[in-house]
Amino acid sequence: MHNANHPHGNGHPAEKKGMGAHSGAMNMPRTLEDGSPACRLIAWEVTRSCNLACKHCRAEAHTEPYPGELSTQEAKALIDTFPEVGNPIIIFTGGDPMMRADLYELIRYATGLGLRCVLSPNGTLITGQNAVQIREAGVQRCSISIDGPSAELHDEFRGVPGAFEQSMRGIEFLKQAGVEFQINTTVTRDNLPYFKDIFKLCENLGAAAWHIFLLVPTGRAAQLGAQVITAEEYEEVLNWFYDFRKTTSMHLKATCAPHYYRIMRQRAKEEGLPVTPDNFGMDAMTRGCLGGIGFCFISHTGQVQPCGYLELDCGNVRDTRFPEIWRKSEYFRQFRTPEEYDGKCGHCEYHNVCGGCRARGFTMSGSHMAEEPLCTYQPRKKPAADRK
């Protein structure tokens, strides 16, 4: 699940008030001693192996073991470096991370260093026994991907009959063990008409949060062109999402949808509502795309990337210490300078809170600095060349 298909794991997890994966987020340092931004979230693909065959899997994961995965010793050495870049939340993702034999050992090790850990399995491998192991290892939240309100739609998308029922059973085991969970849903043309039904399912299950993901056409998802909704439809969906979040106490978040943060500010201004944590929670304190800015992805072989959808090699932890990659990667430097983005994103007045999806721009154009292709907004500011 948010494993290979959602490389951000818990979708910049659980930014809600009180307990949860972002509990204490207010206390995260904003910058490091050298002036680099602190890392808030690390999605770590501890294995690429997965027992499902999801149509939108960016990793095109399969069940067999992958060569070159970090050893237990290498993994622990990597974990030792995480506190040097701030106080990041560690998202154990995959593939399905539960297919890694030493998973609980690694989570316990990270928890022992004071790191907050969340887990992103697809849910089908969760049992009563390992749900207790998940809790005892120190996992603060699990995210489970559900892409339809029933087995028919979900199983077709996941590529394995019975996946829906297995995930439902896994969620029940998490509940029995007292492990908090959220639901992640990828927006496609097929499931969009059922979004209210999916939300109702989230409510009935007792999910702490519902995160929707805008599809990034990489990996197997590159073959899903017909499932990608248009820029105009995304605008409509995100405006609906803004309104819908007011109807529930459940935490709702749009992920891989940086333009939501522009829409949120536009709508809040229309309503005369200050964009503050009291009114919008952590959404008021973050930006749309955190890739290379407050978030990064580490692959199963140790390659550091801005995100799981964007396979830019920023360095490998086997060759260079992770904190050095975080501080000095040229790709990260570029991402941290939004006025250098190409097209309208570079001169948009919302580039500090949105930034566009670098991965979608790269997929569509071949440039990681390209403008967000699924955005209808036309900036009020003119490009610098036009202002001369």
Curated annotation (Swiss-Prot):
The gene is ahbD. It comes from the Bacteria. Residues 1-29 are annotated as: Disordered. Belongs to the radical SAM superfamily. [4Fe-4S] cluster binds at C50, C54, C57. Its cofactor is [4Fe-4S] cluster. This is AdoMet-dependent heme synthase. CDD domains: Radical_SAM, SPASM_MftC-like. GO terms for molecular function: 4 iron, 4 sulfur cluster binding; metal ion binding; oxidoreductase activity. It catalyses: Fe-coproporphyrin III + 2 S-adenosyl-L-methionine = heme b + 2 5'-deoxyadenosine + 2 L-methionine + 2 CO2.
